[in-house]
Structures are given as structure tokens and as C-alpha cells.
């Protein structure tokens, strides 16, 4: 179906008192992303010509958090109801475009449902998203005559008979811009709340003989709003359950779907296995046959085929070629790169460092601002001393180098191909190819040595 041009209004002016937070409610995160960002992304995916964000409380924080989005900021200085919020945005509506109204605290609304609503909107009428609840207490009821929608009555204004109605308003609707402006101008606050209800435009449209078409979402969770942290946590679990189900159906083995969090996007190959309590953040790519152990955090990284990440490892902004092994308890920081078959063991940290093919850093090591060749052995306790208190410097280690345990490499320094660094050495000058570097104090031995005795 060919749709009219469309703009979106997102209401995000509420204080969120029940969140007990200094942060605007809509900036609280779901799956690692602000609730309102989920809604903005949906609007953009629908092809909105403009996104008008109605804000009030915490405007500076909102603008900072959403600075990368192309938004028209609309101030609602006083929160006098949803109709009043839309009135603030109305001057920006074009007469010949459709206006879709969304909410910054309803984060799981799907693009598919919104597209169905858009397609269902009758010419000159209103598309309305509704659901039926077993317990509709507190929600606006949908009134009908002969099956046709005639209006919405808020719970506090409803009669006892109207309160028996189970079909309720979700607050999401779409209408023509010229019609919307005309109806908004007619709103009054003559109701129990003393507010301007956007829902009153339904009755105004009906009185003009306009058709109102109700559409239902695919899932109830799509239209659930967040007023407190308990509700937010419940929607988080709904979202994570849906993501886990999609991954399982796509062939990813999640050992316990209830203990897996996806806070971004995951691209994966075949036969991927993910153990419990793993968190995926940002954009992550997993190759074929990748195995991730329990408690790992993977963020904005590419993991090659046949890699194995042992439990409680953190990988951030890193790239791993095929057949690498990491962990347990390893940390790859931004700029870490492992070439094919490299190994990083327990309590090893890498930052802006490359570990060559087949090279190993088995345990208790820091590799920062380093370029390490192929088939290098990094002994336990090795440290690249890359920082002098003001500037960072680079360590370069050639192919086939053996670095003994408890070695410090004071950058800038280069170790040539095939060199050996004796255990306990502090390297302060370049080491030539195939050379042995040793800086230990000669060992002495005192026969018959007696330990000091504590005085009583």
C-alpha cells in the first residue's frame, strides 16, 4: 500500500516520579539503550520525514543523550495532558502528511505493528491502536456503536457500565496533519483530571463522520508503558526472551536462554555455543563454531571461526582471527587484535596491542601499545611499561621471540626476531635478533644462613 508522507511525534515530557531518579524516565535503558531511543529508531525505520520530540523535565540531559539524532525539539513547559503536548507540536505539522503519535516510555512498539496501523488508517480518518485486557482498570475505554469506534472515555470519567469495557486505548494513533490540527484546537480540559486529552479527538472525528479503524498489536508487551523500575525490569525480560528465541531458532545454542542478555546486535555463523550469563553489547560478530563460556562480556568485537572464549572474559572493541583461545578471566580492551591461533590466558590484559599468529601470553600479563610477532611466547608476569606518566610509548617484539617470566619491557623498545629475554629482566634498550638479554643481579649464596628470631 502506498502511504502518505508521515511525521512522528514522541511524547517524552513526563517527570517519571515513580522511577525515583534524577534521570528523565525515557533515558532509563532497556537492553542497553534508552527507552526513547528504541522509539526514535522505530520512527526512523518507518521512514518518518520528521521526528518531533516533546520534552519538559530534564531537557538538557535529553538533548545531550540524543544529540546524534535528527530531532525537532518541542518544549512542553507545563504538563497539562497528552492533548496539550500534541498542541505544542501542532505548528510543525504539514497539512498533507500523516502524524503518528508515539510515547518515549513505550519502548517495545514494533515497526511491523506501526506499519499495519499506518496501512489501516482510512482516508480522512484515524488509525487507532487498541488492546483487550482482562483487567482494564485505569485505562481509557474504547466506546463503540454497531461495532464502530465512537470515542475513548478515560477511566476516571467513565460510568460503571463503561468501566466494564475490556478494549482499551494504547495512546498510539495516526491521523492527517490538517485534521489533527483542527481537532487539537477544539480540545477542552473539562474532565476529572483538568487536562487536555488527545483521546477526545476520537469523538470529534466521529462527530464529523470520519472513520476510526482499530488495529491490535502482535504482542501486548509492545504497548506496555514504563512508570517504575519494576515495570522496566519486566519489559527487559520480555525483550531478552524474544531475542533469545530468535537466536535459538537461527541455530545459536544458548545453554540457558533466561540467562543471556543481548544489548545490541549479534551477527553469527553456524554452530555457535553460548553458556550462561553472557552479555553481548553493541555490534558483535561471531564466526562459525565459536564457543563462549559463562559470564563473558563481548562488546563491539569480531570473533573469528573456531575461537573459544573461556569463562569470565571481557572483550571490548577487539578483533580475533580464527582459532584463537582466550581466558578464563582475560580482558581485551579497545584496539586488541589476535591473529590466527593466538592464545591469551587467565589474568592477561591487552590494550592497543596485536598478538601474532600462534603467539601465546599464558597468564598474569599486561600488553599495552604493543606489536608482537608470530610464534612468540610471553612468560607469566610480563609487563609492557608503556606509560611514563605523561605519554604512551610502543613496544615491538619480532617473530619467534621468547620472553621469560617476570619481564618488564620499558617502552619505547624493540626486541629483534628470535631473541630471548631471560626471566626477571628489565629491558630498557633494544635487543638484537637472536640475542639473549639478561639484566638480573648475580645470585649469591650464604651457607648456614639463619633467619632472624623474633624477640620475646
From Swiss-Prot:
TM region positions: none
UniProt cofactor(s): Mg(2+)
Keyword Cytoplasm: yes
Gene Ontology MF terms in the entry: glucosamine-1-phosphate N-acetyltransferase activity; magnesium ion binding; UDP-N-acetylglucosamine diphosphorylase activity
Binding site for UDP-N-acetyl-alpha-D-glucosamine: 11-14, 25, 76, 81-82, 103-105, 140, 154, 169, 227, 333, 351, 366, 377
Record text on subunit structure and interactions: Homotrimer.
Name of the protein in its database record: Bifunctional protein GlmU
Lineage, uppermost ranks: Bacteria, Pseudomonadati, Pseudomonadota, Gammaproteobacteria, Enterobacterales
Amino acid at each position: 500500500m502506498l502511504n502518505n508522507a508521515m511525521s512522528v511525534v514522541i511524547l517524552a515530557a513526563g517527570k517519571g516520579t515513580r522511577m525515583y531518579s534524577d534521570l528523565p524516565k525515557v533515558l532509563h535503558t532497556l537492553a542497553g539503550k534508552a527507552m526513547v531511543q528504541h522509539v526514535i529508531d522505530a520512527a526512523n525505520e518507518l521512514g518518518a520525514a520528521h521526528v518531533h520530540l516533546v520534552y519538559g523535565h530534564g531537557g538538557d540531559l535529553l538533548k545531550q543523550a540524543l544529540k546524534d539524532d535528527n530531532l525537532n525539539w518541542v518544549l512542553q513547559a507545563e504538563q497539562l495532558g497528552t492533548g496539550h503536548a500534541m498542541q505544542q507540536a501542532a505548528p510543525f505539522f504539514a497539512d498533507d502528511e500523516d502524524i503518528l503519535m508515539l510515547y518515549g516510555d513505550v519502548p517495545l512498539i514494533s515497526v511491523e505493528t506501526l506499519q499495519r496501523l499506518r496501512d489501516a488508517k482510512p482516508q480522512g480518518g484515524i488509525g487507532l491502536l487498541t488492546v483487550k485486557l482482562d483487567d482494564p482498570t485505569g485505562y481509557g475505554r474504547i466506546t463503540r456503536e454497531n461495532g464502530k469506534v465512537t470515542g475513548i472515555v478515560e477511566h476516571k470519567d467513565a460510568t460503571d457500565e463503561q468501566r466494564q469495557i475490556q478494549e482499551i486505548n494504547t495512546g498510539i494513533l495516526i491521523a492527517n496533519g490538517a485534521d489533527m490540527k483542527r481537532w487539537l484546537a477544539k480540545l477542552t480540559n473539562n474532565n476529572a483530571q483538568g487536562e487536555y486529552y488527545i483521546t477526545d479527538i476520537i469523538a470529534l472525528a466521529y462527530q464529523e463522520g470520519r472513520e476510526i479503524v482499530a488495529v491490535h498489536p502482535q504482542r501486548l508487551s509492545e504497548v506496555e508503558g514504563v512508570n517504575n523500575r519494576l515495570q522496566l525490569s519486566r519489559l527487559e525480560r520480555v525483550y531478552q526472551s524474544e531475542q533469545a528465541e530468535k537466536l535459538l531458532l537461527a541455530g545459536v545454542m544458548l545453554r540457558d536462554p533466561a540467562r543471556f542478555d543481548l544489548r545490541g546486535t549479534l551477527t553469527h555463523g553456524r554452530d555457535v555455543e553460548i553458556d550462561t550469563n553472557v552479555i553481548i553489547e553493541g555490534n558483535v560478530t561471531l564466526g562459525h563454531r565459536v564457543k563462549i563460556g559463562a559470564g563473558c562480556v563481548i562488546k563491539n568485537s569480531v570473533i573469528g571461526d573456531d575461537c573459544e572464549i573461556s569463562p569470565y572474559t571481557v572483550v571490548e572493541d577487539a578483533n580475533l582471527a580464527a582459532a584463537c583461545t582466550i581466558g578464563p578471566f582475560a580482558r581485551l580492551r579497545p584496539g586488541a587484535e589476535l591473529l590466527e591461533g593466538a592464545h591469551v590466558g587467565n589474568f592477561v590484559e591487552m590494550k592497543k596491542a596485536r598478538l601474532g599468529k600462534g603467539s601465546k601470553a599464558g597468564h598474569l600479563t599486561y600488553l599495552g601499545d604493543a606489536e608482537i610477532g608470530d610464534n612468540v611466547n610471553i612468560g607469566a608476569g610480563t609487563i609492557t611499561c608503556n606509560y611514563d606518566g605523561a605519554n604512551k610509548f610502543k613496544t615491538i617484539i619480532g617473530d619467534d621471540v621468547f620472553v621469560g617470566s617476570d619481564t618488564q619491557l620499558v617502552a619505547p623498545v624493540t626486541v629483534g626476531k628470535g631473541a630471548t629475554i631471560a626471566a626477571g629482566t628489565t629491558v630498557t634498550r633494544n635487543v638484537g635478533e637472536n640475542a639473549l638479554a639478561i639484566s638480573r643481579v648475580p645470585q649469591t649464596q650464604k651457607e648456614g644462613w639463619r633467619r632472624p628470631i623474633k624477640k620475646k
